[in-house]
Swiss-Prot record:
This is Lipid-A-disaccharide synthase. It is an enzyme of class 2 (transferase). It comes from the Bacteria. Its EC number is 2.4.1.182. It comes from Acinetobacter baylyi (strain ATCC 33305 / BD413 / ADP1). GO terms for cellular component: membrane.
Amino acid sequence: MYGTCHLSTHKLKIGIVVGEVSGDTLGVQLMRSFREQGIDAEFEGIGGPQMIAEGFNSFYPMETLSVMGIVEVLKDIKKLFAVRDGLVQRWREHPVDVFVGIDAPDFNLRLSKSLKEKNLPIRTVQYVSPSVWAWRQGRVKGIKATIDLVLCLFPFEKNFYEQHSVRAAFVGHPLAKLLPLNNSLVEAKQALGLNPEKTYIALLPGSRKGEVERLLPMLLGSAEILLKKYPDVEYLIPAISDVRKKQIQDGIQSIAPQYAQKLHVLENQDQESKIGRQVMNASDIVALASGTATLEAMLLHRPMVSFYKLNTLTYIIAKLLVKIQYYSLPNIIAGKKVIEELIQKDANPERLAHEIEKLMNNETAKIQMMQHFSMHKQLISGNTEDPVQAIMTLIQ
């Protein structure tokens, strides 16, 4: 274990690996928090554009790890192993004081294991717990052996780890603290230059190429059904890059060209822009792929329908392993069904259109929004620890 005097004689070196946009956001917030607390540190590993803009030294593109699904991962396994081995070699020659794996558990837990197997003097932290409480609970043994500290976003996760004698800290979800409890829909619409009097529905097919390929046709199909019935409603689709924007626009021209004027594709204006969040915030109803974005929509207090369609083989395998009743974070946090979840065959244009239409009823939407508000308050009222202090306590 490192002593305080060891740390005071050199600049702290922190290795971080993130695999997607949400991890990039957590990573840049962590970097800023270290600096705001006057801790002299340098950061390296795999980071996203926000982290790189903050001075992060990224050895590989973040997109290298943006692979979802068991079948998809198997296709890229050699590349992922090469990246892992490259990082281990780098940190064997130039050790960091602590490695913080942010989300991306399948990659980061293996990387932490490799660092421990090489007996490198590196403390290991997993920021964002893998869903061990949901499926593959046997992984908690591996986490106990290879991870020195788990930083949990939700209180029920810390309780789970403590039951298994794993060191954990509940640090709260940064978004719960960042997003205000009082949130104006009218102001959000005006911020995007939208008409506050109009009804907008957000369609979020995801940020990865494969997700958009799989989910956009269903979203556009549901919009077609609803536009025939509600021609004045307009649709907002966020795109995180020019490449994704072109993919979505090509999809619209292929699937629903007659409604192109009602389907607006919006993209990030700058590095700090969060177009997905802005679009959800400016929408009366949100339809989105189950994942971190469902938590964001909940914290914005927007009525939503969640869905997911996996590769068929991936879904069959996952179904055998998953031990929880719900898939979306709002339902998992609440421990009950708060939002509708459409999985696999239920995720089709007709069913999605039907669920969106139900939320057009103001009373139904209002009930869901009140539940979101209540859960938001719960996530910021708990006793949370500062992630930087939790990490510093570990390495001192």
